[in-house]
């Protein structure tokens, strides 16, 4: 009986420790999902890689706010536009994806997607980082 209790306690401790590690890891580190706001707003240790920086633009409601329309893993997201999954397979030409983000009305004049580049909502550098993030999904 004592051995069984020790095994159960040991197993529970292992599970809780694992959950603690997972919950404290930055979301972008998990891969395939958006970074969390804590990661994006960390002034002492800001994200350095383009994928995470692009993810931070995507979830920033004052900037990209992509999650307002798109389903993005790791966010509470919209469902009125294309779901962000298998993006590298769906957009094998990085330049075309960049052009879509820059000004989606060139491909579809009736789109509701804002022309992020043409209207200077995002800088060229921010768009490049968003492209890197989107292609990581």
Name every feature range the model reports, one short phrase each:
Residues 61-65, 73, 126:
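Short pre-active-site segment immediately N-terminal to redox-active cysteine/selenocysteine motifs
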Residues 1-40:
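N-terminal export/targeting leaders of redox proteins
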Residues 70, 134-135:
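Protein kinase-like catalytic domain
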Residues 31-61:
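Electrostatic cytochrome c docking/interface patches
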Residues 48, 67-102:
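Gly/Gly-Pro-rich "capping" loops immediately C-terminal to redox-active cysteine motifs
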Residues 30, 77-87, 102-129:
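Axial heme c-ligation environment in periplasmic c-type cytochrome domains
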Residues 52-56, 82, 95, 99, ...:
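Solvent-exposed, polar/charged alpha-helical surfaces in well-ordered, non-transmembrane soluble domains
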